[in-house]
Amino acid sequence: MILKLVHCLVALTGLIFAKPYQQQQAVLAPSQDVPLRDIHIGDINFIHTTDTHGWLGSHLSQNDYDADWGDFVAFVDILREKILQQSRDVIVIDTGDKRDGNGLSDATWPPGLRSSEIFNMMDYDLLTLGNHELYTAESAILEYRGTSQSSKFKDKYVCSNVEFIEDDGTRVPFGNKYITFETPIMKQRVLALSFLFSFQRANNRAIVTPPLEEITQKSWFQNMVETKREEEIDLIIVFGHLPATDPTEREMHKIHALIRKYYPNTVIQYFGGHTHIRDFVQLDSKSTCLQSGRFAETVGFLSINMTDPVDAESPIFSRRYIDFNKEAFKYHLSKLGHDSNVPVSTKKGKTISRLVNDLRHELNLNEKLGYIPQTYYVSTRPLNSEENLYHLITHKILPNLIPPKNYEPSMSRFILINTGSVRYDLYKGPFTKDTEYIVMPFNNDWRFITVPLVVASRVETYLNKGPVIASLGIPSSSHHKQHFGGFQKCPFINNPNLSEGYTTEDDFGCHGDDTPHNSQREYDIPNVVQCKEVKKVQEEEADPSKMVHVIFYSFMELDILNAVNSIINDLGLRMENLTTNDCSHYGGDSTKKLLRDYFSQF
């Protein structure tokens, strides 16, 4: 009798160690007795957001991030007013990626159609785009015409290395190449530039030039440094959608090296994004870079005292990562105003909160599709844990993939998905329409190829040794955190009075987070995970030459073919290289639909 063994595996590709985690959302509300760390006001103060990805309506299952966009706008408006009253300057900045990740942005077409209007109600002083504004032509058109060229932001939108393609094919700058302005209080003369990382998947309505190529080969930059001389500039702001820490490409550091040649003594402040982490890097004695997390979990705050009273040549930098919640907002406003009863809401903020709530109801995002009986984590539980989301998908979800035509019960199969298709932890509670957009927003088509078992059994390992498989999922951030040195410098926090959350280590140490949290351990995520079904009692009893199905997302086809052909050649098998002609449509529900169906039973 043939028995079916479902053996769903996830490979750690040798990365089986865990390390303290700075990127996990809180599970419990913090104790009201936990003292927060203050922000420090300087000559120039910055409020920074990045990678909000449509999270304008707060985190409904996480108390530590219970503020919505209206609460945030009110916080910024009141904070700005109080800092200006102290005769200090405030600059509010965003560095892109405003869609793909939440129903408020993604339940419309194009994504961001309605959420962009709400996002733009924040009075940003400087803003730019991210790669998620460029995946489709519709998104690029919406961003360019609705934000970049809007009357509110036309003089504040900077994008130094991206061009928009008009209907007639004309190429125009997506935003200003640079802008200059003078701060209202301290009268600091500011030069601002912005760069998107070397993104090569833009649509046919946008062109991205790699930052270094833009700087070294385009005439505008040379004209800028000739007309905006160092003696005429007090501060340079370089903000953009690229990581503060990137050991592989080091684009931020290379940009800094080039700009520093022309402005050797000017204070240069960078603001980054893309890799979804809290980070702060000191580039030299007069330059730092702040990166402020993701998903409206973090408000980045930075201050600069332009001259140190002891050392007039060195500015003083101070950073703080503020948890995106009402209590934190109230705390910082009350400390700044020396008034525990300081108002934390405004008429404008309440209007925005109402608009967010109305949009949620209009898009039916609260529609209950099922129930999640426990919380599942992407990376803060080991891959073999029943609390790990990939473990759930490979053991409980993918085995339910039954296509109407190509399923052969007697045929062994390997079902592979890229881990980037899963965007967020899955929290205990109602499984709603919004949950789908948050955790797994993208539909997929299944393809398959027939290969010998000896080849199929090696595909996962091969892919997990290679580069990140491109998708619209979250960017892989593990290689961007190598500079933390395993977080060995900062203690692992385990305090019963604290909730789990961000415990960030950066170039300034271990106390950048405004709210103390317990540390979590992060387990590295491979490129792919797989569900393996071998139709034998034991896999080792199976004939290695027996043909099996390898099933995968359609956009992974070239990666799969590369893996299969390399394995065939390495094993010396007498087979010709396989091509796209050897791949076929498999059919069946998307992983998104399979996930919904699974939780509908609860």
Which positions does each model-derived feature cover?
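Detector for methionine-enriched segments
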Residues: 1, 121-122, 186, 224, ...
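Classical eukaryotic N-terminal signal peptides for Sec-dependent ER targeting/secretion
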Residues: 1-9
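Non-catalytic terminal accessory segments
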Residues: 7, 14-47, 64-67, 77, ...
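Acidic, metal/ion-coordinating pockets
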Residues: 19-312
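A generic signature of intrinsically disordered, low-complexity regions enriched in glycine/proline
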Residues: 55, 101, 312-315, 327-329, ...
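Short, solvent-exposed aromatic-acidic interface loops
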Residues: 196-198, 239, 315-336
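Compact beta-rich and alpha/beta scaffold cores in large eukaryotic transport/transcription complexes
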Residues: 234, 256, 285-289, 299-301, ...
